């Protein structure tokens, strides 16, 4: 950006069944790294490989279909839709070959959507609109949505931001269980060091675009 390298010469691996924390100050290059992995930003050089498949140069939706999921610092759901409909929409997107093929999600893979909600403890609230949920519950729904494409790698951008300590621990314990149950690889950024030390299997530190 502006002639400066936001990320320069970094290299690391994330194994299946592992939570890897990527930490560093604001502006260190964490978000840039995430955006290169999921195709939102191009890289000048290098390689990003998932299960033997090169991701660099691919479009974000193609990378998503190949098995890279993401959650965001501010949870993203359709507030006017129910919890169940949000997950059904994600499943419909995962199944559709073209956006123009989307149809109403009301009956789409209901059982699969309910199974995902059960994994995050939200099946009892399936018919509630997301607009009335507590924020901790919205984060659980977002996690279920992120599982819709059966990801091999999940990117979690400051997953516990804005959450109370009890909610933080519940969300990360739930994430840890998904890692175990699904053999999922998770790369997450986090500013709360208590969360990092409690839940990360490994920690890498980024500063000024370089690993230290």
Where do the language-model regions lie?
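Glycine-rich phosphate-binding loops of nucleotide-dependent enzymes
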Residues: 1-212
């Amino acid at each position: 950006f502006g002639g400066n390298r936001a990320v320069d010469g970094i290299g690391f691996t994330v194994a299946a069944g592992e939570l890897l924390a990527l930490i560093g100050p604001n502006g260190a290059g964490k978000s840039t790294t995430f955006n290169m992995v999921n195709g939102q930003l191009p890289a000048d050089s290098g390689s990003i490989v998932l299960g033997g498949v090169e991701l660099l140069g691919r479009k974000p939706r193609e990378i998503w279909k190949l098995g890279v999921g993401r959650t965001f610092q501010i949870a993203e759901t359709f507030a006017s839709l129910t919890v169940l409909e949000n997950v059904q929409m994600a499943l419909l997107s995962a199944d559709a070959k073209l956006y123009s093929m989307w149809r109403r999600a009301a009956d789409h893979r209901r059982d699969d959507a309910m199974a995902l909600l059960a994994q995050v403890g939200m099946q009892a609230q399936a018919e509630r609109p997301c607009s009335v949920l507590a924020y901790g519950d919205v984060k659980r729904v977002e996690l279920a949505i992120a599982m819709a494409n059966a990801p091999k790698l999940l990117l979690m951008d400051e997953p516990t931001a804005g959450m109370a300590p009890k909610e933080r621990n519940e969300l990360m314990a739930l994430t840890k269980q998904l890692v175990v149950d699904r053999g999922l690889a998770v790369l997450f950024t986090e500013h709360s060091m208590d969360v990092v030390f409690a839940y990360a299997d490994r920690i890498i530190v980024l500063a000024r675009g370089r690993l230290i």
